[in-house]
């Protein structure tokens, strides 16, 4: 009887210790994540500014306004265009680079890994300004194209809606490919080499080995990077602000950029900005849920 009581006391102590260790992190998550989300939803139902904030009448008027806001609709189209084009290209490049740089016979692979990873260590503002200067009418890209005889005069890449979007997509791919490559490298190094040897003995070529072994074993990592990339692209801000300032004529503006303008640049409207922010939150949550469901192979 005494031994049972002692055993129960030990279990109770372990549970208490576990909850004590868990409590600080749980409190921080609640304060830094859940409270702001709840507060943002409450503000999204209000109008006014500062101490004059009050609930709107009708209460969902900010959300109703979104349906008629052409600029916000344009920002959604722009953001999803970046998402649909940039994310797949970036992740495919990241997987291929990881596969290439995971080769044990490759010389200076540490140096090449560092070179590919370095772009994501640069400042967001700095790299945006570098791309802006490169694609200016008197920038490096125009100078090269003129010398090659492709152009006769400098082309305003950032002054045209289509080319400006392409510049933003190129900038995103350049910066974030190396970041995702690191995750795939870690995943590749956890795959036993004996698996590849067995496939080679069975007569599988390089493409079959990659498609039938590497990709399925990297599936959890691919899903994780895909969700992170979706989350990051839907909240895209720096490139739109620093590269094109949302122009020309809001043709490259992103959702986060428009929310920032609504909240701080134009006449401040915190309620409407919060409503748009909550729409982004719902988009991220829905897309993440779909990704997890599609990638879940458990019975």
Model-based region annotation:
Residues 1-2:
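N-terminal hydrophobic targeting signals that begin at the initiator methionine
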Residues 5, 10-299:
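A structural signal for multi-pass alpha-helical bundles of membrane permease subunits
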């Amino acid at each position: 009887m005494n031994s049972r009581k002692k055993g129960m006391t030990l279990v109770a102590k372990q549970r208490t210790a576990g909850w004590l260790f868990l409590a600080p992190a749980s409190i921080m998550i609640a304060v830094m994540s859940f409270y702001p989300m709840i507060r943002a939803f409450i503000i999204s139902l209000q109008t006014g500014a500062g101490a004059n904030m009050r609930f709107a009448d009708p209460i969902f008027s900010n959300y109703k306004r979104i349906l008629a806001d052409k600029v916000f609709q344009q920002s959604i189209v722009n953001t999803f265009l970046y998402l649909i084009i940039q994310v797949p290209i970036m992740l495919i490049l990241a997987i291929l680079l990881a596969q290439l740089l995971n080769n044990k016979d490759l010389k200076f692979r540490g140096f090449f890994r560092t070179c590919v990873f370095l772009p994501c260590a640069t400042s967001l503002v700095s790299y945006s300004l570098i791309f802006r200067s490169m694609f200016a009418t008197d920038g490096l890209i125009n100078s090269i194209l003129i010398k090659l005889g492709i152009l006769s005069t400098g082309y305003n890449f950032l002054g045209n809606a289509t080319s400006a979007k392409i510049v933003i997509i190129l900038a995103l791919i350049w910066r974030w490919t190396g970041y995702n490559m690191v995750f795939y490298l870690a995943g590749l190094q956890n795959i036993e080499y004996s698996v590849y040897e067995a496939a080679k003995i069975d007569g599988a070529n390089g493409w079959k080995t990659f498609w039938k072994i590497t990709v399925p074993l990297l599936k959890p990592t691919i899903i994780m990077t895909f969700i992170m990339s979706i989350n990051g692209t839907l909240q895209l801000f720096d490139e739109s602000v620093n590269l094109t300032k949302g122009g020309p004529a809001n043709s490259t503006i992103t959702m986060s950029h428009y929310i920032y303008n609504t909240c701080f640049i134009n006449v401040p409207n915190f309620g409407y900005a919060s409503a748009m922010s909550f729409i982004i939150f719902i988009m991220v949550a829905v897309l993440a849920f779909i990704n997890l469901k599609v990638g879940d192979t458990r019975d």
